[in-house]
Every structure is written in structure tokens, then in C-alpha cells.
């Protein structure tokens, strides 16, 4: 496991590094969950996004209600997404560097687990782990999200970050949207997709963060941190 060298009171100390990365709109260039909803949802799914933004429902509650509205087989969803989305430049090289350096890389996503697994297998990201909801294709898509270990966690993403920090790890969080807010606020270092809603939220909260366009520039930052 790679450790990051810090200075505190003039003395160096090492902290294990964990990469926590959102999927939709961060690894991918478009939000696959939103695209799936626009294509296949049988109902007014947008109202749940409004309720989430207003803080009236949780992230998990939002996705549970939205996924219920999706009326399409898994194979059709995968075919549609494969034809419509791209990956953010440099992500495969970033994942490979993390693998070679034994840096933990975890995808945190409120999106479709089966499509994330499809991408992981397609690109051979065998070292990547996924923390997300577990879907079941019934009448619509039902989803069960990880239980929170910490009672004050607002989302499973925040809970994951807290667990890593409890294990004395340094967490670098990558994201783009409202669903990443709590996880990013709990992280040690935050990378936000340039021009994204998460970037605006971090500015409003006074949380130091670094905007990025692609993972090529992020890889340079990581390499410099390990130099």
C-alpha cells in the first residue's frame, strides 16, 4: 500500500492512501443513471432530484424511487449506454498506475451496479473495487444500498470515507455532483470535475478542492505527491 508523506510540527509521517471515485459524470463523461432514466423511466423521475437537492430526501431514497421507474431489461440498458457514453480521458492509465503502486481505488456510485461491473470487466480494471447499491431486476429496478456504520452519515459515500479515515487512511475524493457532497466534505483532498455542481458546492462550503478536466492531469498530481 502506498503511503503519502506529510510534515507535522517539523516531523515527517506516512499515511496510507485511498482513492474514492464517483462513477457517473466523473469516470464517465455523462451521467449513465440520468441517461437511463431519460430513456427508460416510466414516470416523473426528475421530481426526486429536486427533493434531493432541497435536502428533503436522502441520496439512497432518491435512487430507490427513481430506479423503480426504469422499465427495460438489463441487456438493453447496457447496449444503450455502451453506444452513448465515453470515459474521461486518462482514467485507464490512472487506474493502472494505482494498481502498479498498490493504491486502493474504489468506485463509489449511486448508479447501476451492473453497468459499473460491465465497464470494470470491459477495461480489465481488476484491481478496482465497487461500493454501490445492489440492484434486482423485477418490476422496475429495486436497489438496496450499503448500511451505514456511522449513525450521523448522510450517505453511504460519506460513510465509506469515514470508515477509511477511521482506519487512518488519507482519502482523495473525486466527484462531480450533489450525490458526492457529503463524501467530499469528509475527505482529506477533493478533486472536482471542472464546472460541475460539486465544484460549486465545495466553493460554497469553503472546502479546498482542485478542479480537473481529465485524469491525465490528476495522474501528474498523484505522481508528484509520491515523488
Task: Please place each PLM-identified region on the residue numbering.
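Metal-dependent phosphoesterase signature
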Residues: 57-93, 101-103
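Structural recognition of alpha->loop->beta junctions
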Residues: 120-135, 186-188, 200-202
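Histidine/lysine/aspartate-rich catalytic loop segments that bind and position anionic ligands
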Residues: 125-151
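Short acidic-hydrophobic, aromatic-tinged amphipathic segments that line or gate anion-handling sites
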Residues: 131, 191-193, 208-217
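Conserved Lys-Pro-Asp/Glu-containing loop-to-beta segment of HAD-superfamily phosphomonoesterases
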Residues: 152-179
Amino acid at each position: 500500500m502506498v503511503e503519502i508523506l506529510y510534515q507535522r510540527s517539523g516531523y515527517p509521517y506516512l499515511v496510507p492512501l485511498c482513492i474514492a471515485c464517483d462513477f457517473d459524470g466523473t469516470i464517465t463523461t455523462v451521467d449513465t443513471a440520468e441517461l437511463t432514466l431519460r430513456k427508460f423511466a416510466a414516470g416523473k423521475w426528475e421530481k426526486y432530484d429536486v427533493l434531493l437537492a432541497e435536502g428533503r430526501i436522502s441520496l439512497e431514497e432518491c435512487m430507490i424511487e427513481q430506479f423503480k421507474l426504469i422499465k427495460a431489461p438489463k441487456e438493453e440498458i447496457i447496449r444503450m449506454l455502451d453506444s452513448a457514453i465515453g470515459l474521461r480521458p486518462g482514467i485507464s492509465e490512472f487506474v493502472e498506475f494505482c494498481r502498479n503502486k498498490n493504491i486502493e481505488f474504489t468506485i463509489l456510485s449511486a448508479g447501476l451496479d451492473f453497468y459499473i461491473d460491465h465497464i470494470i470487466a470491459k477495461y480489465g480494471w481488476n484491481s478496482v473495487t465497487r461500493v454501490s447499491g445492489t440492484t434486482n431486476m423485477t418490476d422496475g429496478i429495486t436497489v438496496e444500498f450499503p448500511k451505514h456504520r456511522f449513525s450521523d452519515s448522510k450517505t453511504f459515500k460519506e460513510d465509506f470515507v469515514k470508515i477509511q479515515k477511521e482506519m487512518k487512511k488519507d482519502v482523495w475524493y473525486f466527484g462531480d455532483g450533489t450525490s458526492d457532497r457529503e463524501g467530499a466534505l469528509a475527505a482529506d483532498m477533493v478533486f472536482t470535475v471542472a464546472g460541475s455542481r460539486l465544484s460549486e458546492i465545495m466553493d460554497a462550503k469553503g472546502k479546498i478542492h482542485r478542479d480537473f478536466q481529465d485524469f491525465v492531469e490528476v495522474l501528474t498530481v498523484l505522481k508528484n505527491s509520491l515523488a
